[in-house]
């Protein structure tokens, strides 16, 4: 009997031994899940038998990936849950122990419908526990910006409770569409997990949320923070306050300027079909000289990659970076990408692994590849450079004034770059003009999609929640990006800056040499 399918490895037998299955670790995990179900019922997260919880049965003698899994059942009153109601699964999802049937009116026991989704978090993120909540705030949070594919928030204290985030960081939670049956969400959940490597949760529109963590404590803590933040966003929305921007000003209350960014009709009211609500900016060759990226940023990352990997090798962040690089290099080797070399397994000598990683990263940088694994590692290396003041972000002189003007006019400004979101924040947060992030509402990188593909711009328009893609102005220096954005319905301007590549003749786009021309 399998709860969610999957083949079994040769090592599974050891974890399924009678001693482990009937031992203290599994017993404690059963009791813990029952206790958490009762607790979350009081929170309003698992009422009406909905929602579910799963944890790994912690045995220090076994790697987390090989530990048994305890899951709550489906259709059982969570406030009456006891340890004997739990299912126990192997590490690959096979049911090893089921609860006994109870007399009427209890339903026959059934493993949670969330099982295949839980397994995605276990297998793709190495989770130690996963929580599925139907808390009211998780549903309403997906309705605040109809059609948005992400929930975004920044400058709220409780964001610090989410792994990898600080007060000034932007929290981004992917939103997937609901389906009639829980198991039908499995593929879209997996796609969201893959597309958002820093995320520890996925929202399901009009449904609830899946939250995972390294342990049950981490998962519970993050779930509490997420629910708090969603509740805060709902209350801020009711007050007309924008929760997505650093200053939390009024929502869409500022008067729009009469310019390319805003058209007006005779009575002075903005035309909702044509007025520009958002500006999306490229970085290289648009806000920042290409030479700064090619002559300063890239060399710094290249020259410090070995030092960074050596000093942070055992950190969770670097382990995740290495994991992404392994996946990319395996694909590169299959595709015959020049410069790719095999990376030894995790249990190999540290220096051998680092040597292979450095060789691959240097090759990727030389080829200027726009891939998430490289950009994420570069962002972490650059963070050290900015923190030590070895690096300072560079922008063209006209950029700060334009950002201030748009911000004062109530225009939302976003960045879309091949560099990681962290790298973008570092660049704009450490300039000679001070911290320019206060004028920016969000950041998009290659996790959204390739910048030369129309689909990526469609995703951005969905995330920004505009009525029409035509309400977004995109400024870039790359012709192919301009074509893709225009195909998605954006208004597009091409930036002409020193060092930019020449444009094709009769390209058909408006061009500017300074943001002051907009």
From Swiss-Prot:
The active site is at residue 157. In the N-terminal section; belongs to the aldolase class II family. MtnB subfamily. InterPro entries: Aldolase_II/adducin_N, Aldolase_II/adducin_N_sf, Enolase-ppase_E1, HAD-like_sf, HAD-SF_hydro_IA, HAD_sf, MethylthioRu-1-P_deHdtase_MtnB, MtnB_viridiplantae. Zn(2+) binds at residues 132, 134, 207. Substrate 2 binds at residues 417-418, 451. Gene3D superfamilies: 1.10.720.60, Class II aldolase/adducin N-terminal domain, HAD superfamily/HAD-like. GO terms for biological process: L-methionine salvage from methylthioadenosine. Residues 1-242 are annotated as: Methylthioribulose-1-phosphate dehydratase. Binds 1 zinc ion per subunit. Binds 1 Mg(2+) ion per subunit. Pathway: Amino-acid biosynthesis; L-methionine biosynthesis via salvage pathway; L-methionine from S-methyl-5-thio-alpha-D-ribose 1-phosphate: step 2/6; Amino-acid biosynthesis; L-methionine biosynthesis via salvage pathway; L-methionine from S-methyl-5-thio-alpha-D-ribose 1-phosphate: step 3/6; Amino-acid biosynthesis; L-methionine biosynthesis via salvage pathway; L-methionine from S-methyl-5-thio-alpha-D-ribose 1-phosphate: step 4/6. Pfam families: Aldolase_II, Hydrolase. Mg(2+) binds at residues 282, 284, 477. Keywords: Amino-acid biosynthesis, Hydrolase, Lyase, Magnesium, Metal-binding, Methionine biosynthesis, Multifunctional enzyme, Zinc. Residues 279-518 are annotated as: Enolase-phosphatase E1. Substrate 1 binds at residue 114. This is Probable bifunctional methylthioribulose-1-phosphate dehydratase/enolase-phosphatase E1. GO terms for molecular function: acireductone synthase activity; magnesium ion binding; methylthioribulose 1-phosphate dehydratase activity; zinc ion binding. It comes from Oryza sativa subsp. indica (Rice). It catalyses: 5-(methylsulfanyl)-D-ribulose 1-phosphate = 5-methylsulfanyl-2,3-dioxopentyl phosphate + H2O; 5-methylsulfanyl-2,3-dioxopentyl phosphate + H2O = 1,2-dihydroxy-5-(methylsulfanyl)pent-1-en-3-one + phosphate. Its EC number is 4.2.1.109, 3.1.3.77. GO terms for cellular component: cytoplasm. Its cofactor is Zn(2+); Mg(2+).
